From Swiss-Prot:
Function: Inactive tyrosine kinase involved in Wnt signaling pathway. Component of both the non-canonical (also known as the Wnt/planar cell polarity signaling) and the canonical Wnt signaling pathway. Functions in cell adhesion, cell migration, cell polarity, proliferation, actin cytoskeleton reorganization and apoptosis. Has a role in embryogenesis, epithelial tissue organization and angiogenesis.
Principal location class: membrane
Organism: Mus musculus
Post-translational modification: MMP14 cleaves PTK7 between Pro-613 and Leu-614 generating an N-terminal soluble (70 kDa) fragment and a membrane C-terminal (50 kDa) fragment. Proteolysis by MMP14 regulates PTK7 function in non-canonical Wnt signaling pathway.
Region feature Interaction with CTNNB1, mapped onto this chain: 786-1062
Signal peptide: 1-22
Stated name of the protein: Inactive tyrosine-protein kinase 7
Domain Ig-like C2-type span(s) in chain numbering: 23-112, 120-210, 217-309, 301-399, 404-489, 495-578, 570-672
Tissue-wise expression: Expressed at high levels in lung and un-pregnant uterus among adult tissues, and in the tail, limbs, somites, gut and craniofacial regions among embryonic tissues.
Stretches assigned to the Extracellular side: 23-696
SUPFAM superfamilies registered for this protein in UniProt: Immunoglobulin, Protein kinase-like (PK-like)
InterPro entries: Cell_Adh-Cytoskel_Orgn, Ig-like_dom, Ig-like_dom_sf, Ig-like_fold, Ig_I-set, Ig_sub, Ig_sub2, Ig_V-set
Glycosylation site positions: N98, N108, N176, N206, N260, N275, N397, N455, N559, N638
Amino acid sequence: MGARPLTLLRALLLPLLAGAQAAIVFIKEPSSQDALQGRRALLRCEVEAPDPVHVYWLLNGVPVQDTERRFAQGSSLSFAAVDRLQDSGAFQCVARDNVTGEEVRSTNASFNIKWIEAGPVVLKHPASEAEIQPQTQVTLRCHIDGHPRPTYQWFRDGTPLSDDQSTHTVSSRERNLTLRPASPEHSGLYSCCAHNAFGQACSSQNFTLSVADESFARVVLAPQDVVVARNEEAMFHCQFSAQPPPSLQWVFEDETPITNRSRPPHLRRAVVFANGSLLLTQVRPRNAGVYRCIGQGQRGPPIVLEATLHLAEIEDMLPFEPRVFIAGDEERVTCPAPQGLPTPSVWWEHAGVPLPAHGRVHQKGLELVFVTIAESDTGVYTCHASNLAGQRRQDVNITVATVPTWLRKPQDSQLEEGKPGYLHCLTQATPKPTVIWYRNQMLISEDSRFEVSKNGTLRINSVEVYDGTLYRCVSSTPAGSIEAQARVQVLEKLKFTPPPQPQQCMEFDKEATVPCSATGREKPTVKWVRADGSSLPEWVTDNAGTLHFARVTRDDAGNYTCIASNEPQGQIRAHVQLTVAVFITFKVEPERTTVYQGHTALLRCEAQGDPKPLIQWKGKDRILDPTKLGPRMHIFQNGSLVIHDVAPEDSGSYTCIAGNSCNIRHTEAPLLVVDKPVMEDSEGPGSPPPYKMIQTIGLSVGAAVAYIIAVLGLMFYCKKRCKAKRLQKQPEGEEPEMECLNGGPLQNGQPSAEIQEEVALTSLGSGPPATNKRHSAGDRMHFPRASLQPITTLGKSEFGEVFLAKAQGVEEGATETLVLVKSLQSRDEQQQLDFRREVEMFGKLNHANVVRLLGLCREAEPHYMVLEYVDLGDLKQFLRISKNKDEKLKSQPLSTKQKVALCSQVALGMEHLSNNRFVHKDLAARNCLISAQRQVKVSALGLSKDVYNSEYYHFRQAWVPLRWMSPEAVLEGDFSTKSDVWAFGVLMWEVFTHGEMPHGGQADDEVLADLQAGKARLPQPEGCPSKLYRLMQRCWAPNPKDRPSFSEIASTLGDSPADSKQ
């Protein structure tokens, strides 16, 4: 290849290689901006790089040192108070790669600093006051300066000068006032004020112009502003001259004249002297204000001079944060001087001695300066501020940090499995070092397995086999860090892996195996023996710990022992009881059934097995409890389910679950409730011929008669059988229960007419019409207000009052029922819509873990929503009581298994709610109810006005549960099932902390800021398994799409073992 192609190739590759090495990228560069003198400002700089980078700032090419006023905040530069002199110039953000040394600089950024500064009014022309004569030109200059250039306004004796250019001209550019020609009428006190984008300032010293005219009053001595302490005296001096002598009068703000004969009530101690001076003794706050001295000559206008009396005051000083510095650096601490009048004087002291103006440690202005800080400078320094009103002081604790030194390094260790293990990391330094531990280069966070003590020792509460690895401890202070590592070898204990289940089942007449394995420091020998010491039958073999039954017999049942042993650790035993069982099979399985509305449905289910199986039904996503089914449903002893007076909402999938101590099986079938078709009286043109109709009727009747005969035969047989059983089992005088024989119910030994009719409906045959006994939903929900007897008020919600009441006849079979009543007392349209939304939600939901809507009172205002209530009240109070230290109030402590069960029930209720396309919006422990049987129901008490007011935050004209809300719900008003999932994660955290307030150490505004920044996370509760905390964290995923569904949550909680630590 020639030289020219090589040159071209090199020219193409070099930019690519250079681009590949430029790993540092500015995500946000500083930009020039406006700033106000003495106000806060921030130059932002954000860097992205694969390696650690060091970010610092330059001002006009010189590195910027941190001070109290100007300091680095992360990678940005923060200004507590912008200074137009010290902060003028070009700032640059510089990022240096600590690994490669690469350095990247941002573009220049500067401040356009806006300011205004007061100054005096001075005579510019003529050269001196003595040269001022009538008819001469007089020019005054206002020495107020600022940026941008201010606009000026001139005053004579406190009155703004008009724009009349015949007597004077104003030059804003030169800041001049020119009087041409000057006359006695121009005499007076001249002042100026100016304003710009920063603010306004007035002249600090005014000019008294006196143009000679003996009859005009001229100022000889003008009063000055006075600042005095409370109860001290104040003196104003004021003199005029004229021929004849002028009059002089003092007035206060309310224009009331002050004389020695007549004084205002609040100036009883005022004295006016013959020379015109005004004395105020024992000054009170009410005496502060503007005093005017008015001089009037024989001719000319009156001259009004003003002076203000201020009471001295001084504010409290802001406290210091403790400061930690590194030896050898230059450090500065600025004293936050308090506001005061007059301006307080500030000085620093150390050990009661004021600091000098020069030296290694000295005071410069408000700053405490350490030219080169040393370890001996550690101590308490005091900033003092003082004026006429008193003195203030604040201490700052300064610590000079040192690099840690070793007291005891971690050592390679052998730790026994299952016992506590310790690794020591003992160091000393100033301040006390911070110690962190790493396991396999991964940071160890404290949880139920690991603890780091205050002296740096790592405790492994229960050593596991996989804890055998490399550990590293790092001890650090701001001055630096040291580290050391140690390897842990775990001495494994002799144990079964896994322990055999103490009770196991084998299927009769089938092949079966029972495994048993163990591990230890040396591989153990594993064998099986019968518990009674007898030898194993010849058809049973023991193959290295696996018990093999070629064909299980009844005699194989019994107690067996697995023995594992090795030489150094001895032996361990596990006892197993083997049961020989006939696994469950279904004799009769439920079939797809179609039933007319208002009729009776029969779902047959029979199972067999040994031990005899028990049958349960599951319908509409909940287990049907035989004791709580109500009059419409009944489960017979043989397992069949009958539903009377069926309604469309009974449609759905029904599951028959058969189980015994050895196995469980289930089968399901759908139930469809349809409207009964209307039969036409007259034949249409398409009607079948008469003989076809007769043939159809004959076949139908014949089939029905045959079926009835078969059913009656079975009923007669089963009736005798059941009567015999009842005679054997039932106590004397007990009423026989309704039973079901192969799906046919009996009442007092007679077949039910409803069941006979149901048979025809199931097969969609024609039968006699039946009256639908169900009322419309609106009629069914109406409940008379007179049947409610209020008991006690629970609190107030956004809608209105929430109270407990006794409701008469609200539930079938109960005379009185304890209910929760929510009233709608608000006129707000949105709250009325929300009230109707809750009514619709609880009216449509039907789940064991969601409260039921029992009735509505709408015949008068306020409207009432009558909801189901349970005996122990809301879950929040229950959790708090379970943690209460008062033994009289404390309930049984909650185990991890019970906490998981509580969360699982809420998840099941929310799964049902979300499957029906509803969003709760306020899911929390306070809005769930719990019974004495620990059954939890999702509700919506919403006691935001009083009881739980602290758990709500007023945001955008509404009270919201801020600490339970997802970022998109708070900031965008986007409520969804995924925002309910976020709230469920917080509810789980409440359960495991026994009802603590989420983010309890933060104010509402801080929680809102964390939500906006995406940092709102709750810590892992004490004793909470890591697996469950990871589930909480998934619920708090920033992206709603990354959060689990309630179905997944319910499944995860259902699979969680009570003692899970992973």
